[in-house]
């Protein structure tokens, strides 16, 4: 059991890396713990991650826990691309050596839940805390009424644009695109021999699927019928979205390969001049502020197809505990202490993550109120996200790996291999229906 030795005051938390941190330095390591007095926490932020403010937040999180609990947390940093698109996490679980605590997106939830890897956190949560989480980000962490993860954040997608690129192309605010046709036309004007006009994700993976869902939904497409029993992927909305993604590449206004970690990386792409517009999440605000503060940019809602209906897609990483941990009690207690407490220190911790260390939207009402009191959404891109981008939103769905792969294959075929959207959607729908006929797992949503 992770037994607290003394309470943490709000002042001591805000004090940062102080005496308590020096007395109990953060532990780091490469493998999962088999020590009953230690739990491992794998993440793609720190220590030593690309964004210092985010790395520091994770280091301080572990230090605060370690200073007040007998069971210690050992952090392991896994580079973002390896964590989200590589085999590191899956391989560790296949070998029976998965971390005690880790970060999980909705897109990968069913892989781990259906495999029996996720610990039920419900016994550790009060009804008050459960009601404090926004339902749209909790629903993909629930199976029945049981909670299997606590969200860190809400991360909507939008379109970032370079103000300098617009000025060079003699484009003004009135030229900002609102439709797909306008987006392609503006991207063409912004394209130069050294810069693409726009950028969408090209790397296959859960992140690309997540960004594609926004286009699909805006065009009226769906993956499943409303009862979740059959594929609806072979429909006109999906065809239109696949065609649009293909058009961006065949028109020469978007690259076949993104730079850096992927299209979730603002620093290697738009702020570095590789593209003039980029579909990107709210986290880009903090990235640019910390590492490219002189880059001038704006944010608008992602353009939608003519006759379509605007929406954004909501990403949201959650902290989860390994059901097969050697100390599941401590793993669960750590997750709930970090993100699921009514303690003022927990609220302040989450506020700092959501609006200082990594700009995003808080997943808890209490944290939203605290962020508003600090003026987090009063101006600039954060205000645009809160007031305009979030006008209509849908959370990232959770699909089993077989469904994800069918969708990914269709997107990759059309975007990069000049595949026929109708044929690609039909093939994916057939694969999904075949899989559904024998699926036996948690509800898909």
Q: Which residues are covered by each model-predicted region?
A:
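Extracytoplasmic "Venus flytrap"/periplasmic binding protein-like
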Residues: 68-136, 140, 168-170, 175, ...
């Amino acid at each position: 059991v992770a037994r607290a030795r003394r309470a943490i005051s709000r002042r001591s938390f805000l004090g940062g890396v102080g005496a308590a941190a020096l007395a109990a330095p953060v532990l780091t390591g490469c493998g999962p713990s088999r020590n009953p007095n230690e739990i491992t926490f794998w993440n793609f932020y720190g220590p030593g991650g690309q964004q210092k403010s985010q790395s520091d937040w994770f280091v301080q999180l572990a230090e605060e826990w370690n200073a007040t609990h007998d069971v210690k947390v050992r952090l392991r940093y896994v580079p973002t691309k390896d964590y989200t698109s590589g085999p590191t996490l899956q391989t560790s679980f296949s070998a029976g050596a998965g971390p005690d605590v880790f970060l999980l997106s909705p897109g990968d939830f069913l892989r781990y839940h259906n495999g029996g890897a996720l610990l039920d956190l419900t016994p550790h949560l009060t009804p008050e805390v459960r009601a404090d989480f926004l339902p749209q980000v909790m629903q993909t962490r629930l199976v029945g009424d049981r909670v299997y993860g606590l969200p860190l954040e809400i991360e909507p997608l939008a379109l970032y644009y370079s103000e300098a690129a617009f000025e060079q192309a003699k484009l003004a605010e009135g030229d900002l695109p609102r439709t797909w046709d306008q987006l392609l036309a503006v991207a063409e004007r912004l394209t130069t021999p050294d810069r693409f006009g726009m950028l969408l994700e090209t790397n296959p993976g859960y992140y690309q699927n997540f960004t594609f869902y926004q286009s699909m939904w805006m065009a009226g497409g769906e993956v499943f019928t409303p009862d979740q029993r059959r594929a609806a992927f072979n429909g006109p909305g999906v065809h239109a979205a696949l065609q649009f993604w293909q058009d961006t590449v065949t028109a020469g206004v978007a690259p076949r390969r993104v730079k850096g970690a992927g299209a979730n990386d603002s620093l290697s792409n738009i702020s570095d001049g590789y593209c003039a517009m980029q579909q990107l999440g709210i986290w880009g605000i903090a990235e640019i502020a910390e590492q490219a503060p002189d880059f001038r940019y704006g944010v608008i809602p992602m353009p939608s197809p003519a006759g379509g209906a605007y929406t954004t897609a909501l990403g949201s990483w959650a902290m989860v505990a390994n059901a097969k941990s050697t100390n599941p009690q401590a793993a669960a207690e750590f997750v709930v202490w970090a993100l699921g407490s009514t303690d003022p220190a927990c609220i302040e911790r989450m506020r700092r993550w959501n609006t200082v260390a990594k700009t995003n939207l808080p997943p808890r009402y209490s944290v939203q109120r605290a962020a508003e009191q600090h003026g987090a959404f009063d101006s600039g891109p954060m205000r645009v996200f809160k007031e305009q981008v979030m006008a209509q939103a849908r959370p990232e769905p959770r699909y089993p790996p077989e469904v994800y792969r069918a969708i990914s294959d269709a997107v990759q075929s059309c975007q990069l291999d000049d595949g026929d959207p109708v044929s690609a959607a039909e093939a994916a729908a057939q694969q999904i229906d075949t899989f559904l006929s024998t699926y036996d797992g948690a509800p898909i949503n």
